[in-house]
UniProtKB/Swiss-Prot annotation:
Cofactor: Mg(2+)
Top-rank EC class of the record's enzyme: transferase
Family note: Belongs to the protein kinase superfamily. AGC Ser/Thr protein kinase family.
InterPro entries: AGC-kinase_C, Kinase-like_dom_sf, LATS1-like_MobB, Prot_kinase_dom, Protein_kinase_ATP_BS, Rho-assoc_Ser/Thr_Kinase, Ser/Thr_kinase_AS
Biased composition (Pro residues): 69-81
Domain of life of the organism encoding this protein: Eukaryota
GO terms, molecular function: ATP binding; metal ion binding; protein serine kinase activity; protein serine/threonine kinase activity
Name of this chain's protein: Serine/threonine-protein kinase Warts
List of residues binding ATP: I725, G726, V727, G728, A729, F730, G731, E732, V733, K749
UniProt KW keywords: ATP-binding, Cytoplasm, Cytoskeleton, Kinase, Magnesium, Metal-binding, Nucleotide-binding, Phosphoprotein, Serine/threonine-protein kinase, Transferase, Tumor suppressor
CDD domains, per database record: MobB_LATS1, STKc_LATS
EC number: 2.7.11.1
Length: 1105
């Protein structure tokens, strides 16, 4: 026995007590406890004092805890008390004071200046720490603090004094028993000031129990809450590396030496308080509210080990309270501690009021939670949970989790209020529990994590009950999942039904649209067939119109199929839904997706049926249903149709662009010519500069007005019909006057489009318009306006009142040679003017030679004129034409009989060479050249053949190749060498006979290769060709008044009515007019139409502004 272990205050009777006291005395002589001084917070490391005087620093490896002595079974743990050091050792170098802390106990001095023999045996090599709270921070400078700040299961209250002080290094004063060094620092390193004393307990409780004696100030700092520890855990080996920075430092589930000493002394009643045998009652861990009389003690708290191992992740619950630990940043993902936040289940039954109890000797129960109990500041009362003693049959790991409810946050809160709230919550929970048992769980109830009820017994629930509760929770979760799956399936079914309804609605809209399109195609087809039949009846040898330019390739695939019942995609096969316009024609696609079926724009809402088949889509007009339009008048509807955008072939585009560019260039040239002509006239007259400037301004103003007038639309209502002049094969000629210029008369030639198209005269009409528009000389009838409407084409020309040459021939019979010489000379000049413009008239005859009021001639009727342009070629306007078609009179037809045909390049070269030749059979057979009839190619020399035939008719009185039928006439013209005879009774002069022989000859020997060859002939001796129009004509027609038409042949009224344009219905050409492009760029307006210059040559014609 150690000599220091002598008994103080009596020697115990039994052997066990003696051994315990002996061990305690050894501890007191081995360790010296340091105190934290209140003012001086500097920390002094604990050291060993050896016999040889050397002090070894106590490193963290020496902070060991002694294995506690096993108390007797009847002993119970006593509350923490402060044991003052014995008088024999206080103040000595080897003495010290004992401090209960979370770090450990250090020894500064040893009695008698030496280390005890048991020192080596009591210090293990490594500290065995609880593995769940191993941390990375060093623990040598921080002491144990309240578990409310460092434990995951602690309270989340924020009214701790740790958060209100700055950090100051703490220290321990060795040998200072009066210092308040027992106040532990916070985990974050903040220094703490000793808190004030707790509020006074209930006065009713003090009357029933013995009041505790006052605690001396020196030992107030040692008043501590119980530290969580377990004595039934197997020890774990701590890692050899540096410890973590967690402020929670346990003693491997064991008590520190001061706690062991306090518990053992309390169980043996070795330290009576106040010098009497009464036991000193420590301050209770709870705020006692209620008397101490007969109230049953509260049930023991559950096992801390079981609660640590049974914690789950937090989930939403109606009866859960989330208790979060402070975010100190020391818990890592690999920590074995409890997760935070922790679901704490509230017990359904009301809690019993805490009663003061007498600490009796009982079996040792491990303390699982410890917190600082302040004595100076008003702190909330924290909860201390004590783990009950585990039964020997069941292990601690299988115990169910029971966590007590948190106490009120502030001590001022009345216990009655808390009890009422707990009772109300318990009653609501009990009713809800009964309701849940009576009715199946609904899917809206969130899953419960922990056990929602706690049995009203002191013993923990058995393993079977725990497994039953878990099984019930699993079944409830499965039921909820099944109900959620059923709801999802129902929603999917509803969505599918809605999609099917939308698909059916879209299908109905598409069916109605397809039906409308089929009806429209049938109507178009009927109209096309009717027009083709009419055209075939009018001209059986003529080919029909071509089909629309864009055709669809689907003939049998236009059936509308029902859509597949997919969730999101609507597969609808509809050949009519193509892009507009389709270039090239869109092929049928079975996988075409109709994304706009619900927004197609159909407003009729008809529910059409599924179409089994439909006709082939020959023309795509639109991609969406035609909306219903307001009912308007027929005139407005016709006007609207005129501006509808229509599809045309590439030939139409080529035709339009060539004509448009040609007209633009022509307008520029004409404007430049007028400007230069004005400058020439002003320079010739010698006008002053100021006058020249004014003239130029007037010309520019005229040009601007002309451009505006060209854009103005014209119609026949702008003219007033006076009387008819003549009737032709395609229309009529009428004397008219313009409304705004009544002093000028015009001859308006009207051509019906239907007749032009039937007889394939589109190229001729186009050529006549171009010649009359470009001809700006005095030998050609001047064209002022040209325009069109839906049914007719209109030419507004200058009125020539003297009639035509044919009327004069009929009237006179045979011309005198002087009269014939005059008219032949003027005809020669007129033909030369046409040739200079690059045209060939090809229809020179007495009917097309007009005589004006002065007796001079003008050429007209340029319907058969050609300018060697592709727009003047009739083959271009032939229906169903293609690039592979060849002219029947092309030169390589001869090679097909005698040998192989020329190659493609040779044919192209020959075609280019033959471009200057004409191969069409046109004109009157009496006046046409033989090369034209033979289609061997002709040039402008063919017009001089016609001049020779007219001279023959003037002098002889009849055509040279007169016959009973046109076919006989044609044969005579071809065999002209045998059939051309000049009768001697005509008594023609030698010059006239020679000129006829020279003009009516073969093309290689004919006069006319140049106009000078003709003018230099002896027949024209004495004729001044330079001033022909200034000479007085030998014949002046008789004109009684400006509107006199007696010089023309009378018009048959029956013929006139049958050809009246106003009587035509217009249905014959309505469809063709919409699709035909030959009449583009037909409108024309001449410059200076209101002020016409006098008849002058081009060189002398001034520009009137």
């Amino acid at each position: 026995m150690h000599p220091a272990g002598e008994k103080r205050g009596g020697r115990p009777n039994d052997k066990y007590t003696a051994e315990a006291l002996e061990s305690i005395k050894q501890d007191l002589t081995r360790f010296e406890v340091q105190n934290n001084h209140r003012n001086n917070q500097n920390y002094t490391p604990l050291r060993y004092t050896a016999t040889n005087g050397r002090n070894d620093a106590l490193t963290p490896d020496y902070h060991h805890a002694k294995q506690p002595m096993e108390p007797p079974p009847s002993a119970s743990p006593a509350p923490d008390v402060v044991i003052p050091p014995p008088p024999a050792i206080v103040g000595q170098p080897g003495a010290g004071s004992i401090s209960v802390s979370g770090v450990g106990v250090g020894v500064v001095g040893v009695a008698n200046g030496r280390v005890p023999k048991m020192m080596t045996a009591l210090m293990p090599n490594k500290l065995i720490r609880k593995p769940s709270i191993e941390r990375d921070t060093a623990s040598s400078h921080y002491l144990r603090c309240s578990p409310a700040l460092d434990s995951g299961a602690g309270s989340s209250r924020s009214d701790s004094p740790h958060s209100h002080h700055t950090h100051q290094p703490s220290s321990r004063t060795v040998g200072n028993p009066g210092g308040n060094g027992g106040f532990s620092p916070s985990p974050s390193g903040f220094s703490e000031v000793a808190p004030p004393a707790p509020p006074p307990r209930n006065p009713t409780a003090c009357s029933a129990a013995t009041p505790p004696p006052p605690v001396p100030p020196t030992s107030q700092a040692y008043v501590k809450r119980r530290s969580p520890a377990l004595n039934n855990r197997p020890p774990a080996i701590a890692p050899p590396t540096q410890r973590g920075n967690s402020p929670v430092i346990t003693q491997n589930g064991l008590k520190n030496p001061q706690q062991q000493l306090t518990q053992q002394l309390k169980s043996l009643n070795l330290y009576p308080g106040g010098g009497s045998g009464a036991v000193v009652e420590p301050p209770p861990p709870y705020l006692i509210q209620g008397g101490a009389g007969g109230a049953a003690p509260p049930p023991p708290p559950p096992s801390y080990t079981a609660s640590m191992q049974s914690r789950q992740s937090p989930t939403q619950s109606q009866q859960s309270d989330y208790r979060k630990s402070p975010s100190s940043g020391i818990y890592s993902a690999t920590s074995a501690g409890s997760p935070s936040p922790i679901t704490v289940s509230l017990p359904p039954a009301p809690l019993a009021k805490p009663q003061p109890r007498v600490y009796q000797a009982r079996s040792q129960q491990p303390i699982i939670m410890q917190s600082v109990k302040s004595t100076q500041v008003q702190k909330p009362v924290l909860q201390t949970a004590v783990a009950p003693q585990s039964p020997s049959s069941a292990s601690a790991s299988n115990s169910p989790v029971h966590v007590l409810a948190a106490p009120p946050s502030y001590p001022q809160k009345s216990a009655a209020v808390v009890q009422q709230q707990q009772q109300a919550a318990a009653a609501a929970h009990q009713q809800q529990h009964q309701h849940q048992q009576s009715k199946p769980p609904t899917p809206t109830t969130p899953p419960l994590v922990g056990l929602n009820s706690k049995p009203n017994c002191l013993e923990p629930p058995s393993y079977a009950k725990s497994m039953q509760a878990k099984a019930a929770t699993v079944v409830q979760q499965q039921q909820q999942q099944q109900q959620q799956q059923q709801q999802v399936q129902q929603q999917q079914v509803q969505q599918q039904q809605q999609q099917q309804q939308q698909q059916l609605q879209a299908l109905r809209v598409l069916q109605a649209q397809a039906q409308r399109e089929r009806d429209q195609r049938e109507r178009d087809q009927r109209e096309r067939e009717r027009d083709q039949q009419k055209l075939a009846n009018g001209n059986p040898g003529r080919q029909m119109l071509p089909p629309p330019p864009y055709q669809s390739n689907n003939n049998n695939n236009s059936e509308i199929k029902p859509p597949s019942c997919n969730n999101n995609n609507i597969q609808i096969s509809n050949s009519n839904l193509a892009t507009t316009p389709p270039i090239p024609p869109a092929k049928y696609n079975n996988n075409s997706s109709n994304t706009g079926a619900n927004s197609s724009g159909g407003s009729n809402g008809s529910t059409g049926t599924t179409a089994s088949s439909s006709t082939s889509c020959k023309k795509i007009k639109h991609a969406s249903p035609i909306p219903e339009r307001k009912k308007i008048s027929k005139e407005k509807e016709e006007e609207r149709k005129e501006f509808r955008i229509r599809q045309y072939s590439p030939q139409a585009f080529k035709f339009f662009m060539e004509q448009h560019i040609e007209n633009v260039i022509k307008s520029y040239r004409q404007r430049t010519y007028r400007k230069n002509q004005l400058e020439k006239e002003m320079h010739k007259v010698g006008l002053p500069d100021q006058t020249q400037i004014e003239m130029r301004k007037m010309l520019n103003q005229k040009e601007s007005n002309y451009i505006r007038l060209k854009r103005a639309k014209m119609d026949k209502s702008m003219f007033v019909k006076l009387k008819p002049i003549g009737v032709g094969a395609f229309g009529e000629v009428t004397l008219v006057s313009k409304i705004d210029t009544s002093n000028h008369l015009y001859a308006m030639k009207t051509l019906r489009k239907a007749d032009v198209l039937k007889r394939n005269q589109v190229a001729h009409v186009k050529a006549e318009r171009d010649i009359l528009a470009e001809a700006d000389n005095n030998w050609v009838v001047k064209l002022y306006y040209s325009f069109q409407d839906k049914d007719n084409l209109y030419f507004v020309m200058d009125y020539i009142p003297g009639g035509d040459l044919m009327s004069l021939l009929i009237k006179l019979g045979i011309f005198e040679e002087e009269l014939a010489r005059f008219y032949i000379a003027e005809v020669t000049c007129a033909v030369d003017s046409v040739h200079k413009m690059g045209f060939i008239h090809r229809d020179i005859k007495p009917d097309n030679i007009l005589i004006d009021r002065d007796g001079h001639i003008k050429l007209t009727d340029f319907g058969l004129c050609t300018g060697f342009r592709w727009t003047h070629n009739s083959k271009y306007y032939q229906e169903n034409g293609n690039h592979s078609r060849q002219d029947s009179m092309e030169p390589w037809e001869e090679y097909s009989e005698n040998g192989p045909k020329p190659t493609v390049l040779e044919r192209r070269r020959m075609r280019d060479h033959q471009r200057v030749l004409a191969h069409s059979l046109v004109g009157t057979p009496n006046y046409i050249a033989p090369e034209v009839l033979e289609r061997s190619g002709y040039t402008q020399l063919c017009d001089y053949w016609s001049v020779g035939v007219i001279l023959y008719e003037m002098l002889v009185g009849q055509p040279p190749f007169l016959a009973n039928s046109p076919l006989e006439t044609q044969q005579k013209v071809i065999n002209w060498e045998k059939t051309l005879h000049i009768p001697p009774q005509a008594e023609l002069s030698r010059e006239a006979t020679d000129l006829i022989r020279r003009l009516c000859a073969s093309a290689d020997k004919r006069l006319g290769k140049s106009v000078d060859e003709v003018k230099s002939h002896d027949f024209f001796k004495g004729i001044d060709f330079a001033d022909m129009r200034k000479q007085k004509a030998p014949y002046i027609p008789e004109i009684k008044h400006p509107t006199d038409t007696s010089n023309f042949d009378p018009v048959d009224p029956e013929k006139l009515r049958s050809n009246d344009s106003t009587m035509s219905s217009g249905d014959d050409v309505d469809q063709n007019d919409r699709t035909f492009h030959g009449f583009f760029e037909f409108t024309f307006r001449r410059f200076f139409d209101d002020k016409q210059p006098p008849d002058m040559t081009d060189d002398q014609a001034p520009v009137y502004v």
